[in-house]
């Protein structure tokens, strides 16, 4: 079980379509479940246009993606995770339908995924991917969600 830590969380819904489904209390519980250290995190739900702009400007990829994580470290000795995590509502809803999951279930996975990225986890190599996916599966199970990698 991961250690629960102090959290300062800001949630922004410029794309308001999911704010009644993916509520602030749910988001707080999902973020806290994935935290290994104290954190200051902003979650922002955007439409496809903003998601595409951010992905193009920061990753050089000209399409909207499901989640983008921007991790910030003010100093290397800081124990506080600081990040902006951007979730694209359009992509989230499309992927949930394609994967036959509820929007809530898929959003929980993407939030956990983004929080792990903010803490330095990645999936560039097979070993990194295995470690990150194992953590995601454990965290989501603790939250009452099924393994997100089954039937993909």
UniProtKB/Swiss-Prot annotation:
GO terms for biological process: rRNA processing. Single strand-specific metallo-endoribonuclease involved in late-stage 70S ribosome quality control and in maturation of the 3' terminus of the 16S rRNA. PANTHER family: ENDORIBONUCLEASE YBEY, CHLOROPLASTIC (PTHR46986:SF1). The keyword Ion transport does not apply. Its cofactor is Zn(2+). Belongs to the endoribonuclease YbeY family. Keywords: Cytoplasm, Endonuclease, Hydrolase, Metal-binding, Nuclease, Ribosome biogenesis, rRNA processing, Zinc. Its main location: cytoplasm. It comes from the Bacteria. Zn(2+) binds at residues 113, 117, 123. GO terms for molecular function: metalloendopeptidase activity; RNA endonuclease activity; zinc ion binding. Coiled coil: none annotated. Pfam families: YbeY. GO terms for cellular component: cytoplasm. The keyword tRNA processing does not apply. Its EC number is 3.1.-.-. Binds 1 zinc ion. This is Endoribonuclease YbeY. InterPro entries: MetalPrtase_cat_dom_sf_prd, YbeY, YbeY_CS. It comes from Janthinobacterium sp. (strain Marseille).
